[in-house]
Amino acid sequence: MGAPPRNAPVTTGFLVLSSKARDTFRHVTEPAGHALARAGITANGLTAIGLAGSLGAGALIATGQPVVGGAVSLLSGLPDMLDGAVAKASGRASRRGAFLDSVVDRLSDAAVLSGIVFFAVVRDLGTMATLAALVLGLSLIVSYIKARAESLGFACNVGIAERPERVIVLGLALLLGHAVAGLWVLLAGTVITVVQRILVVWQQSDVGPDLGR
């Protein structure tokens, strides 16, 4: 059976919605990026601050301070959301910077979620530990799908639970003392995002599934 057309409704709808969300986000970050660049703040500096904050948040959570850790995690997300805008505003956007940013994002995710796993295991909170481990694994899969798809030439900027959404949901859940509820939301969101990205890439590909196998 042949593949769906490249402009299939599912693919087009996902990409249009994601494009609108990115445009809205860009209207907020671009002015801030220009202001920070004029102040001499560098994109790599912001990336480093974000990573340090995430590592600190993970350590705070692991040592029994999830509320403070949630607040720090939210704050650490701010420089991470602005480093790309600063790089563009300063004319220093590069593939090396994009690569570094992607690696740091994965390390930041791992730091906070690993902190939750440690916190939960020490206190015998099985549900929380399991959810955090699943969200961590699925978050890495979400990122891998995009990286692999783009390396093959496919557009894959879709998903209801990309990194900014994950940082906000998890940070607020920890801050408000509802970590398990937040993790359930993230689990559902990351599963949906995995499916969205697979569908988008599948419908852009030339080879469809062989239903006779």
Language model feature labels by segment:
Residues G40, L60-G64, G115, L175-L176:
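Helix-loop junctions at the membrane-solvent interface of multi-pass transporters
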Residues G2-G33, S102-R213:
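A feature for the membrane-embedded catalytic helix bundles of lipid/isoprenoid biosynthetic enzymes
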Residues E30-T42:
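Cytosolic juxtamembrane amphipathic/interface segments immediately preceding
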Residues G2, R38, L46, L55, ...:
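Structured catalytic core of nucleotide-sugar glycosyltransferases
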